[in-house]
Amino acid sequence: MNSKGKYYITTPIYYPSANLHIGHTYCTVMADAMARFKRLQGYDVMFLTGTDEHGQKIQTLADAKGVTPQEYVDEVVAGIIKLWETMEISYDDFIRTTEPRHIKSVQDMFMRMYEKGDIYKGEYEGLYCTPCESFWTESQLVDGKCPDCGRPVTKAKEEAYFFKMSKYADKLLELFREKPEFLEPETRRNEMIAFVEQGMEDLCISRSTFDWGIPVPIDEKHVIYVWLDALTNYITALGWNTGDELFEKYWPADVHLVGKEIVRFHSLIWPAMLMSADLPLPKQVRGHGWLLMGGEKVSKSKAAKGQDVIDPVILIERYGIDALKYFLLREYTFGQDGIFTNEVMLRRMNFDLANDLGNLLSRTVSMIKKYCGSEVPEATTKDAIDEELIELAVNAG
């Protein structure tokens, strides 16, 4: 089959502070299904996933364990790769932000933005959420806590480099107006428009109170802040600024698939960075909802408390890979939150796989055995309706 063109899809790069949970698996299974479908349609697909390995939280966890940050992430990342292999995730590249190729790419991105006049040194004083690696103002907090994860924030004051995000506010609003499909679903887009319209502050992009990160090329007392580091992975993997033909072939990305808690970084910070660097913007960001347990987002902290129901490895052992994938793709409406429990999963498998599809398969096999000598006969006709259905299936999406 001749290629219909290129298709570049990415998951977020996951933070290896602990083993991944069912929410990460949900996102990755969706991306894998989209990549596989596009390949079946005849597209030349590039599917990227990976890990975001720098930051204060990793350094703190490594110190508590008595190992280096690199040793800490190496152990967790090995488990993530094993999980995706077990799940038969068909990624084309797995990028780690501690790789030399990425360090060079991030420093090149910093310098391009700096030379554009969009980075300056100042002092940050405000509120910081360590788990989210996010800075906030008092007005952005919800009940005095991080608006993304609901955890407490701490006061921070340090010298830092800043990106002139405020310079790109009007361009971002113009992007949402002229290309509403850039961010889906609509609820996420409306949230980001409101966020920009309330007034954007410049973005802190370096830290000087810890050293587990990529050094700022013009000032090695600073490490580059995690979001400038992490977001650049999408072009690092294509060999940006190295002459690699992959970048010319696959960029811009067709879709960044992310959880709703990081839509802001992908739909505001990332396009502003690319505007500063004079690079094309991705075609689309899609923000999926959360999987909820007891009315709360499934999280690593819940997994740490022994709630093994959200551990994908245990779910695979209990139900099988295909059943888990089917459930994740079938049960939830994209963009909306959904309830996850063992009972919900069992009900879906029994209704769909055992009753509907299982009974259909059983009856079909019985008829083939009874009337066709246990051999599937070749099709003898191909009606117009068959052709229409085949065309719809091939061209869907």
Language model regions located:
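Flanking scaffold residues of small Cys/His-coordinated metal-binding clusters
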Residues: 123-124, 141, 160
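A broadly conserved sequence feature marking short terminus-proximal activation segments
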Residues: 72-128
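Cys/His-rich microdomains that often coordinate metals
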Residues: 136, 153
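The −1 position to Zn-ligating cysteines in a subset of zinc-ribbon hairpins
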Residues: 112, 128, 135, 145, ...
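Structured secondary-structure scaffolds
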Residues: 2-49, 101-105, 131, 149, ...
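A charged helix-plus-loop insertion that forms the helical arch/lid used to bind
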Residues: 61-74
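Acidic, turn-prone loop/beta-hairpin segments
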Residues: 52, 372-397
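A non-catalytic, amphipathic alpha-helix used as a structural packing/dimerization or gating element
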Residues: 33, 71-82, 108, 356-363, ...
